[in-house]
Each structure stands twice: as structure tokens, then as C-alpha cells.
């Protein structure tokens, strides 16, 4: 699996089409718990897109994203991560040919966002159980010589309800979280 992190306009049209096909399937089937998150997704609203390909076909993607709510120079990484159905078995949720399939994707995004001199950058997840997140990011930190930490509490990352907007953050240990904590 190869990973490429590009500005939206740098993506090949076939890759944009493949991303849209993955999204369309998720939205039309409504089986993914978060399918509604993809109804208004636009490749062109993202700061950068990372695609994971096998034989030049997109099998997974995620993006670097910012919004007014975050404040200036704050970026969300690993935004809207999806894997195509035909790659779920090959790529699995964890590994592809012995490598954790999304760690390189995350590292490419971390490296890129650092070039922007950000005030803060983060990944977030709606789930409160952090055991697996801590395991993955311990592995990530060792493999890529980084210092990402998983928050002990949840933070408001958007205007909305508690379920969708209060999330666990993964962020650099030396950065100060700019969001209000939940409870």
C-alpha cells in the first residue's frame, strides 16, 4: 500500500472519483455509524488529502482539515478516514502486510502540517474508550519518533451536541489544547 498526501487540486481525477465512490457507498448503505458525516464532504474543502492506494486504486483516504471553530492555524488530521469495502480484508482495521496501515498516513499528515507552523494539530475520535488509541499512538511514537498523547478527557471540537462534538484528542504533548473541555 502506498500513501500520498496532496492538495486537493493535485489529486488525479480518477482518485477523486474513487474517493467519491467510497463515500457514496457509505452514505447510500447507511451501515457506518458515522455515515451522515460524509453527506456534505468535499475533497476541495480539505487542506490536504492522503490517499492509500494499491495498484494505483484508492483503498483508503483521510484529510487534513481546518474550520473557523478551531481558530487560526489549528488543524485536524486523519479527518473522515474511510477504507473501501474491497480493501477491508486486505487492509483490515489494523495491518496490511505486517504494517499498521494508517500510521504512515498519519505520519505524512503530521510532517506536512508541521510545515505550516501550526498553533495546534490533532486527531479526534468520538469514542471514550482510549485503550486502543493509546496502544496505537505508543507504537506510532516509537516508530516515527513523535510525541503524540491521547487526552484523558474529551473536548468540544464543534458546535453541536455532546455525542458528535465532544471528542477524545490525540495531539503533540508540547502543545496546549485550544478547545473547551467537556465536563
Region annotations inferred by a language model:
Residues 149-183:
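C-terminal "cap" of GNAT-fold acetyltransferases
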Residues 47, 115-119:
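Short, high-confidence coil segments that cap the C-terminus of an alpha-helix
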Residues 135-152:
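Conserved acetyl-CoA-binding loop of GNAT-fold acetyltransferases
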Residues 18, 22-26, 108, 112, ...:
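Charge-rich, solvent-exposed alpha-helical interaction surfaces
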Residues 121-137:
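Conserved beta-strand-loop-alpha-helix junction that forms the acyl-donor binding cleft
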Residues 1-36, 51, 183:
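Short amphipathic alpha-helix that is part of the acyltransferase structural core
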Residues 30-83:
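A conserved beta-strand-loop-helix scaffold within acyl/acetyltransferase catalytic domains
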Residues 83, 89-113:
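Conserved acetyl-CoA-binding loop-helix of GNAT-fold acetyltransferases
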Amino acid at each position: 500500500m502506498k500513501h500520498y498526501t496532496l492538495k486537493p487540486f493535485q489529486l488525479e481525477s480518477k482518485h477523486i472519483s474513487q474517493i467519491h465512490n467510497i463515500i457514496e457507498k457509505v452514505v447510500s448503505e447507511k451501515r457506518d455509524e458515522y455515515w451522515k458525516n460524509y453527506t456534505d464532504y468535499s475533497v476541495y474543502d480539505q487542506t490536504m488529502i492522503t490517499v492509500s492506494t494499491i495498484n494505483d486504486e484508492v483503498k483508503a483516504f483521510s484529510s487534513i482539515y481546518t474550520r473557523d471553530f478551531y481558530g487560526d492555524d489549528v488543524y485536524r488530521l486523519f479527518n473522515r478516514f474511510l477504507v473501501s469495502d474491497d480493501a477491508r480484508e486486505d487492509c483490515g482495521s489494523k495491518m496490511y502486510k505486517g504494517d499498521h496501515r494508517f500510521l504512515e498516513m498519519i505520519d505524512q499528515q503530521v510532517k506536512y502540517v508541521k510545515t505550516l507552523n501550526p498553533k495546534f494539530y490533532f486527531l479526534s475520535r468520538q469514542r471514550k474508550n482510549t485503550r486502543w488509541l493509546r496502544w496505537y499512538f505508543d507504537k506510532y511514537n516509537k516508530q516515527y519518533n513523535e510525541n503524540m498523547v491521547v487526552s484523558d478527557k474529551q473536548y468540544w471540537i464543534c458546535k453541536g451536541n455532546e455525542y458528535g462534538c465532544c471528542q477524545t484528542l490525540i495531539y503533540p504533548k508540547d502543545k496546549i489544547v485550544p478547545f473547551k473541555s467537556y465536563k
